[in-house]
Amino acid sequence: MKTVVFAYHDMGCLGIEALLAAGYEISAIFTHTDNPGEKAFYGSVARLAAERGIPVYAPDNVNHPLWVERIAQLSPEVIFSFYYRHLICDEILQLAPRGAFNLHGSLLPKYRGRAPLNWVLVNGETETGVTLHRMVKRADAGAIVAQLRVAIAPDDIAITLHHKLCHAARQLLEQTLPAIKHGNILEIAQRENEATCFGRRTPDDSFLEWHKSASVLHNMVRAVADPWPGAFSYVGNQKFTVWSSRVHPHASKAQPGSVISVAPLLIACGDGALEIVTGQAGDGITMQGSQLAQTLGLVQGSRLNSQPACAARRRTRVLILGVNGFIGNHLTERLLCEDHYEVYGLDIGSDAISRFLNHPHFHFVEGDISIHSEWIEYHVKKCDVVLPLVAIATPIEYTRNPLRVFELDFEENLRIIRYCVKYRKRIIFPSTSEVYGMCSDKYFDEDHSNLIVGPVNKPRWIYSVSKQLLDRVIWAYGEKEGLQFTLFRPFNWMGPRLDNLNAARIGSSRAITQLILNLVEGSPIKLIDGGKQKRCFTDIRDGIEALYRIIENAGNRCDGEIINIGNPENEASIEELGEMLLASFEKHPLRHYFPPFAGFRVVESSSYYGKGYQDVEHRKPSIRNARRCLDWEPKIDMQETIDETLDFFLRTVDLTDKPL
């Protein structure tokens, strides 16, 4: 049976050997070039392929149409993936009539995603395993073909568990590959309600937080012990690595991170104490704990910290351009709730941020980004993270003032992007769900969905195209110049301070603000083209929490990523939004101050937005990247968001007149 294989690491090598032993004909193998920054303790798939006389390739993007066509020419009957690190597109999966199968290092549906070997140890699991499953478009979500359980012993570390999993995988493949070859397999659908998903781990994720329990820290040490990069901590600014440890039943009132003794080297934790059995100072040699204490100059009562002492003292400086806007003011509030951010902001007004103006860690200048270019360049250079949130983002303006939209949304933001490249600053750029345009996918996916817009004579697309081109420019700067970036795409965020009722009076606002104005003034709610267009509405608190996690960037997991931020469960048509808003309005304690409801009125989009408008029937996000990179899920129901947004705006209305 002809097969094409995607493979890497030891699992890739043993998978290839198992296929050959089972009589499969391997037409080609796709693998990765080794990362020079990664310790290569594992077997080489490329070398094995060469020794076996099998063509081997390591493309940067195997999902490129040229590679899809080459794989199609190989006519594989079945496809296998063994620890290949990139998601394989659906077009490739569909090339094999007998299907595609992936070997995953956990007991699916638990521990989908990256680095399951390390995550099970971090989380103190006592059992894991290997799973062979059918590949579908969603990562690690296909039906299970075979599983083998592996016990995790208390003394297992990453490398010993790795060897156990390799042994189990070899057994599983020996038993299962002949059955796949003869079409004699039983598939069991995964239970989605039991699924868990974990993201990529980097060396920076493995710092020891001494306020946690000794058992939790010991599990971290086990999870990343040699040949992985190791768990680490600091003495002042001196970094050291812990290679092995023991949980010590020592009851101490010492502060977490304090040295209890140096022989053995015992460190107080949030609960219990951790004995450092072996470790390494800086780039030195491995030594036993008491010698490490001597090398680091530790004595009883010394304090360890999770980050360098100098880093712990300096706040992260965040520059927010458009700080008075809907996202900017809510994000400022979230950042200032923490004690490690300094926020610098620029905007043409300050009404939404007036509550922060006296905050010691908030610095505001009133001004226009098209005028204050020197101030902006200076602060890009000064700050650590830049969020250029200035944009015209109201649909009526796309047809009313398309050139102004282009000048502000594209030209001014391009200048800021180039400052970030020049001074090597991290940029978190607000893309938009509008870039997907008229995409027909059920879920809009950051990495695979096509971005489809209308003809040139429909100026409503100038916003979408301006944002899309900036996305592509930022991506290219990341690839070619090393720009550190994250693109985030908000899907219909709603909440207090979304536009204002005065903006709604001239039509320059988002949907819910316009609908609230209609209720306040007693004018008919206008349903553009019947209001059947569906959107997924997201509470501003959910959106800001995701954006905050992008800024935090744990383990640099957000670098180079595009992340949809939306709530696919909160899908509703504009008509349904209007009905929900009306029901909330009728129950509101201030209802009697406002005129009677004037009804719904259907209007054509051309009469409301102008002749250059086109609408989109649906816009539902895939949030797999948000789950993977941010460990984030939206939580707030749409009705709660509507109630709070309505309440906020009703309480801004002058109610000096008598009730109606």
Curated annotation (Swiss-Prot):
Residues the entry annotates as binding UDP-alpha-D-glucuronate: 393, 398, 432-433, 460, 492, 526-535, 613
Catalytic activity, as annotated: UDP-alpha-D-glucuronate + NAD(+) = UDP-beta-L-threo-pentopyranos-4-ulose + CO2 + NADH; UDP-4-amino-4-deoxy-beta-L-arabinose + (6R)-10-formyltetrahydrofolate = UDP-4-deoxy-4-formamido-beta-L-arabinose + (6S)-5,6,7,8-tetrahydrofolate + H(+)
Assigned GO CC terms: membrane
Transmembrane segments: none
Molecular function per GO: carboxy-lyase activity; UDP-4-amino-4-deoxy-L-arabinose formyltransferase activity; UDP-glucuronate dehydrogenase activity
One Pfam family linked to the record: Formyl_trans_C
Region of interest called Dehydrogenase ArnADH, as start-end residue ranges on this chain: 314-660
Gene Ontology BP annotations: lipid A biosynthetic process; lipopolysaccharide biosynthetic process; response to antibiotic
Site feature location: Raises pKa of active site His: 140
Superkingdom of this protein's organism: Bacteria
EC number: 2.1.2.13, 1.1.1.305
Active site: 104, 434, 619
Record region (Formyltransferase ArnAFT): 1-304
Residue sites binding (6R)-10-formyltetrahydrofolate per the record: 86-88, 114, 136-140
InterPro entries the record matches: Arna-like_SDR_e (IPR045869), Bifun_polymyxin_resist_ArnA (IPR021168), Epimerase_deHydtase (IPR001509), Formyl_trans_C (IPR005793), Formyl_transf_N (IPR002376), Formyl_transf_N_sf (IPR036477), Formyl_transferase-like_C_sf (IPR011034), Lipid_A_modif_metabolic_enz (IPR050177)
Family that this chain belongs to: In the N-terminal section; belongs to the Fmt family. UDP-L-Ara4N formyltransferase subfamily.
NCBIfam families in the record: PRK06988.1, PRK08125.1, PRK11908.1
HAMAP family: ArnA (MF_01166)
Quaternary structure and interacting proteins, as annotated: Homohexamer, formed by a dimer of trimers.
Protein name: Bifunctional polymyxin resistance protein ArnA
Organism name: Escherichia coli O6:K15:H31 (strain 536 / UPEC)
